[in-house]
UniProtKB/Swiss-Prot annotation:
Annotated source species: Escherichia fergusonii (strain ATCC 35469 / DSM 13698 / CCUG 18766 / IAM 14443 / JCM 21226 / LMG 7866 / NBRC 102419 / NCTC 12128 / CDC 0568-73)
Family: Belongs to the glycosyltransferase 26 family.
Pathway(s) annotated for this protein in UniProt: Bacterial outer membrane biogenesis; enterobacterial common antigen biosynthesis
Signal peptide: none
UniProt xrefs under HAMAP family: WecG_RffM
Gene: wecG
Protein name as catalogued: UDP-N-acetyl-D-mannosaminuronic acid transferase
Catalytic activity: UDP-N-acetyl-alpha-D-mannosaminouronate + N-acetyl-alpha-D-glucosaminyl-di-trans,octa-cis-undecaprenyl diphosphate = beta-D-ManNAcA-(1->4)-alpha-D-GlcNAc-di-trans,octa-cis-undecaprenyl diphosphate + UDP + H(+)
Keywords on record: Glycosyltransferase, Transferase
GO molecular function: lipopolysaccharide N-acetylmannosaminouronosyltransferase activity
Function statement: Catalyzes the synthesis of Und-PP-GlcNAc-ManNAcA (Lipid II), the second lipid-linked intermediate involved in enterobacterial common antigen (ECA) synthesis.
EC number: 2.4.1.180
Keyword Translocase applies: no
GO annotation (BP), single: enterobacterial common antigen biosynthetic process
């Protein structure tokens, strides 16, 4: 019988990744023995692997995060190739965030939301309260000045939040979480990118069948042809994968 409160780790190009079998494993791991883990969650996909390779500051930021997990199907396939016995599946960050919010609502876990446009953040708060009765103890949209950061960190600390989700894009959100943890270490932090936009319907996500087939990247490319340059960068990752340089 599998123990869902522990998880193996796998190394890709020097980066330690948690190997979750599925979403339930991820949730049971993060809420092991009824106690929410503390630290930072970072979703890893092929694009982020490339950024880590090219940017020493980002690499240090992400290496310092306790919970790095495979958000991209390419990363999952690379883990399975390097470790043929690995029972690891993709856990999409947007889905994990929703499941965390549902669990937080059920257990009354205090949540602080950071990032996004003011109207999107307001809609996110309203939907979280209506859908799962989430205990939102504070929020801040992404439009604040650098000199306001410290006061925001103090607000988060004073709120007693046990989950802090940050939608600012990478690496801004990783920098924010690292610095905020110096003031408020006793929480689970999660960088969520554009998740608030998807959750509120401002951005359409790929249909489930595309996600299941591992083609969400292709759906986004067809929806946004301007992403072609970003996708072409991934050829470098494919070279690593197919040459076994993992």
């Amino acid at each position: 019988m599998n123990n869902n409160t522990t998880a193996p780790t796998y190394t890709l190009r020097g980066l330690q990744l948690i190997g979750w079998r599925d979403m339930q494993h991820a949730l049971d791991y993060l809420f092991a023995d009824g106690q929410l883990k503390q630290g930072t969650l970072v979703a890893i996909n092929a694009e982020k692997m490339l950024t880590i390779e090219d940017n020493a500051e980002v690499r240090a930021l992400i290496n310092a995060a306790e919970f790095k997990y495979a958000d991209g199907i390419s990363v999952v396939r690379s883990v399975r190739k390097k470790y043929p016995q690995a029972q690891v599946s993709r856990v999409a960050g947007a889905d994990l965030w929703e499941e965390l919010m549902a669990r937080a609502g059920k257990e009354g876990t205090p949540v602080f939301l950071v990032g996004g446009k003011p109207e999107v953040l307001a809609q996110t708060e309203a939907k979280l309260r209506n859908q799962w009765n989430v205990n939102i103890v504070g929020s801040q949209d992404g439009y604040f000045k650098p000199e306001q950061r410290q006061a925001l960190f103090e607000r988060i600390h004073a709120s007693g939040a046990q989950i802090v989700t940050v939608a600012m894009g990478s690496p801004k959100q990783e920098i924010f979480m690292r610095d905020c943890r110096l003031v408020h270490p006793d929480a689970l932090y999660m960088g969520v990118g554009g998740t608030y936009d998807v959750f509120t319907g401002h951005v359409k996500r790929a249909p489930k069948i595309w996600q299941t087939l591992g083609l969400e990247w292709l759906y986004r490319l067809l929806s946004q042809p301007s992403r072609i340059k970003r996708q072409l960068r991934l050829l470098r990752y494919l070279r690593w994968h197919y040459t076994g340089n993992l």
